[in-house]
């Protein structure tokens, strides 16, 4: 079953914990710390593949990459978690399901985007040795991997989009001009999902057609099937309005343009042609009168018959010329990935009480594993290196004042 909208959850792997371990071997009475590092958690990527034609292949609703292994003694590092690559159709747009931000537009074969970054592995206790800290009994825990909900929207990539009423002969026209085999039947709403076909102009030149389910009056208010599929013509360079010559084509064109404009006014400015289909059902004079009346609407009109093939060579040439002279439409650009902002902010919350907001420092605090008291010296080094000490002094924090940061609370003792 064709599916062009899907919400999934992606979760990257957690980083492995660093080990608290000491060398214990015969004849080595004072072995030092030898805790290995944890492995990095696997990340989650989306990759565009032309061989994938629908989001329905994504059978799961949650996708999780592998966690990193924990470090071990004897300086043994944990193995990194395996990355997870999810293949999606070309033309898939990726949104953050909670914020609505566009994260990626995967239009090229093999184009890959990182959607959930794996957590960093924690460092083992052998990294925290210093002249005053010979046997650290603490290490770093691994970071949690990113987790987010994604909304995937497939927008077909084609040069020409076919727009018309149900049973106007769009699928027949697609089949007559290309090697596509859409379902064709003498009743409305035969086409329930978009179809693609390639029109071969010569051995070197070709262009693609996209046929979407028929649009009816009131589609912009939720009637019928066509409106929800109009996104599939948003990328097309040219629109081809397919009209049934025997069924009020002037009124039909007016309705189609009204509904298309209600979906996206920019589509009305897209270069367009009119294919007056099923002319084999009318007399030549009637066809000419209809074509002249439609031409007064400001669009080039080509009488055709998908059944007999009449007018199709001229339609191919006209579409090809328009495609060649029209650049691809501008699409919304993805939002650049936001990195954690560095910096330190000291905020007074009460008399003699201050809160420190420093994302990078809070990351260090959250990852301490083991003896916190023994880690105090290391944390003081982190505070100095990250500018917390300087920020507290600049804010006028005095000895004995209460400082809160990352869930910890302590009395401030200025460095001498």
UniProtKB/Swiss-Prot annotation:
InterPro entries, sorted: G_OBG, GTP-bd, GTP-bd_Obg/CgtA, GTP-bd_prot_GTP1/OBG_C_sf, GTP1-OBG_CS, GTP1_OBG_dom, GTP1_OBG_dom_sf, OBG_GTPase
Entry GO terms, CC: cytoplasm
Bias (Basic and acidic residues) ranges: 63-72
Domain OBG-type G: 158-324
A GO molecular-function descriptor: GTP binding
Any single biological process term in GO: ribosome biogenesis
Positions bound to Mg(2+): 171, 191
Role according to the record: An essential GTPase which binds GTP, GDP and possibly (p)ppGpp with moderate affinity, with high nucleotide exchange rates and a fairly low GTP hydrolysis rate. Plays a role in control of the cell cycle, stress response, ribosome biogenesis and in those bacteria that undergo differentiation, in morphogenesis control.
The protein's name in its UniProt record: GTPase Obg
Recorded name of the encoding gene: obg
